Amino acid sequence: KLMHDLLAEDGSMYVHCDWRVSGYMRLVLDDIFGTNNFQNQISWYYRRWNIASSQFARSHDDIFYYAKDKGKHIFNNLYIPKSAKSSGNGKSWVSVIGDDGVRRSVLTEEVSKGSPMPDAWEISVINPVGLERLDYPTQKPEELISRIIKASTNENDLVADFFCGSGTTLAVAEKLNRKWIGSDLGKFGIHTTR
């Protein structure tokens, strides 16, 4: 509730959780923000080695996205770049359906932004031997945090992470020219963030 109260009127909150608490978390967030301020449930899909067991292999977590005020929140559309063929002079081919109902490829002057970002994000977990890895148990990939920050803030906006853990959110906010503030309850998180 306190974090909700501290949000700017055009602010939003993203909450990451896994299958153990996602159902409960959604109910708590609906109570705090109101169901009308729920924006998306994002599925963060990742690939990793799965061991055969008596259930489906777990390969995603949930991220709940809420606005403080649905009518005022910042949302910058993100796009997946098209893999369309491009001509030598920068023009691109797009698929259109004509008046006769037949699909055709047409050369366009406009450079396509791509397809609007869906709510299923395939982003790899951090490589166990990668330079990005800090050995913090709940560390998120910079690509995941970057996508969230770009979608809901503009340059010089303030990004807050009240459970900053490894400090990934703060590092990405700095790279994207955002102001930031972070806190954590654990000494290990604070020392890792430094």
Label the model's feature ranges.
Residues K1-T192:
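Core catalytic lobe of class I
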